[in-house]
Regions:
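Alpha-helical transmembrane segments and their short interhelical loops
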Residues: 41, 45-115, 119, 165-171, ...
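Membrane-interfacial helix-loop-helix junctions in multi-pass membrane proteins
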Residues: 74, 125-180
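A residue-level signal for alpha-helical anchor/packing sites in multi-pass solute transporters
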Residues: 21, 30, 64-65, 69, ...
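Long, hydrophobic alpha-helical segments
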Residues: 2-18
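Transmembrane alpha-helical core positions of polytopic small-molecule transporters
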Residues: 8-13, 24, 56, 60, ...
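Transmembrane helix boundary and interhelical loop/hinge segments in multi-pass membrane proteins
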Residues: 15-39, 193
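Junction motif at the cytosolic side of a transmembrane helix
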Residues: 23, 99, 103, 158, ...
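Short helix-loop-helix connector
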Residues: 35, 39, 104-105, 129, ...
């Protein structure tokens, strides 16, 4: 359960804060100043995402230390794989938060939309109940749920001591979903409104 809780912490750190980022600038009126600069929107979105990725890696370090100090649990597998998985999940959630922020008009709307999707992603990820016990129609959704890939891979690395080959499928899925969402975040940002 401890490795799977990393997913919830990653959602909170890298999902909610970016969801509030651009929409707070819209409310304050500072987005107009950014829009008139000659900065490419890829650079702008990347500049918005990098601080959340760095913060996420710091939080993963704190979580690993707390798991060791409080519960006496240390990862059996490679710690670098844990950081790789966490980085890929933070790519997804920070991009998803920026997508929501791009489409939202105010902070309340952004938070409610993010909350709606986070609850669904957690419930359908296999964190609390095994994915195999879900009805087949619902089980299909785990193939597009990055949290389920993250939890499976974290359990494999953290508890079973799996190597990169044992989680290559999950890493590839997280990378593809994260890149898709990152591209969507850039494309959904409109400099001219």
């Amino acid at each position: 359960m401890i490795p799977a809780l990393f997913a919830i912490i990653m959602m909170l750190m890298t999902g909610y804060l970016p969801a509030l980022n651009i929409v707070s600038e819209k409310e304050a009126g500072t987005i107009e100043q950014i829009n008139v600069t000659p900065v490419n929107k890829w650079v702008f979105i990347l500049a918005k995402l990098i601080p959340y990725w760095a913060r996420a890696m710091f939080v993963v370090t704190i979580c690993l230390l707390l798991a060791w100090v409080v519960y006496g649990i240390t990862p059996v597998g490679n710690i670098a794989l844990i950081y790789l998985l966490s980085l890929l999940l933070s790519l997804f959630f920070s991009s998803f938060g920026l997508i929501i922020s791009n489409y939202s008009d105010n902070m309340q709307q952004s938070m409610l939309i993010m909350w709606f999707f986070v609850v669904i992603l957690i419930q359908l990820s296999g964190l609390f109940t095994p994915s195999r016990s879900m009805p087949s129609v619902v089980y299909i959704t785990t193939y597009i749920n990055p949290v389920s890939y993250f939890i499976d891979a974290m359990r494999t690395v953290f508890i079973r001591g799996g190597n990169f080959n044992s989680i290559a499928h999950q890493v590839l899925a997280l990378a593809l979903i994260g890149l898709f969402m990152g591209t969507w975040a850039v494309m959904s940002y409109k400099k001219n409104r």
